[in-house]
Amino acid sequence: MAVSSLAGLGLRREMLAEFSQSVPAQIDFFEVAPENWMALGGKYGKQFRALTERHAFFCHGLSLSIGSSAPLDIDFIKGIKAFLDLHGIAVYSEHLSYCSGSGHLYDLMPMPFTPEAVRHIAGRVKQVEDIIERPLILENISFYAAPGAQMTELEFVLAVLEEADCQLLLDVNNIYVNSINHNYDAAAYLAAMPTERIRYLHVAGHYVEAPDLIVDTHGADIVDPVWQLLCDCYALHGPLPTLLERDFNIPPIGELLQEIDRIRDYQAAAIRTSRRAG
């Protein structure tokens, strides 16, 4: 089991002023959506640049649309590369989905789970990597319907990782959400993930619409079943770098730090267990 424990926080613009003064020691890295920061100037732009000069950053994109039938937006991808280069960011991930037809949309739509889609995505991953000169990391998304599926979501994700020879951003909350919405075994899904391809993890809260319908909102505290799944993930795959996502109903930083502390505690426990076993 690799010892690679880091805990991070998704940076939102309203946090800039506070973190410009100081960054709590519990936060090992930040994550941003480049689309929200690429054109930022003025005071916010200077504050952001000062942060990226002093702290580790990952990028998690919103609108690459890796699965779309439309051609890749080469100018957009070149802009992403320029942003990553400017801020010295090596880690760039995107959603295993599509969000565009004739233009960019921010609704992330699930891919059809088919061998044809696997081949389509794999080819586009190579195109993107050639431009950004970095690995393109893909994230398992939450989905609410799977029209035309010829394989399970698990089979689809594994096939894409293999065909594209790419890394995975494993979203633990999305596994839980999908397991409830589609009645599958979250533990079995987690165990099937290839450890060597997992680059880092996401964990977040969600909204329970009904007993059999959960919506992935990133707008609430993490619930106990997701915490347990995160612990199970560490036991199986090691205490991987883990990012706390909170996009809505953002509480005071102190409350977010409590969840980050919990991530760090679980990572430390996994390391202790591994050392005893070794």
Swiss-Prot record:
InterPro entries named in the record: MbnB/TglH/ChrH, Xyl_isomerase-like_sf
Superkingdom of source: Bacteria
Chain segments annotated as coiled-coil in the UniProt record: none
Similarity comment: Belongs to the UPF0276 family.
Record protein name field: UPF0276 protein Sama_1305
Protein species of origin: Shewanella amazonensis (strain ATCC BAA-1098 / SB2B)
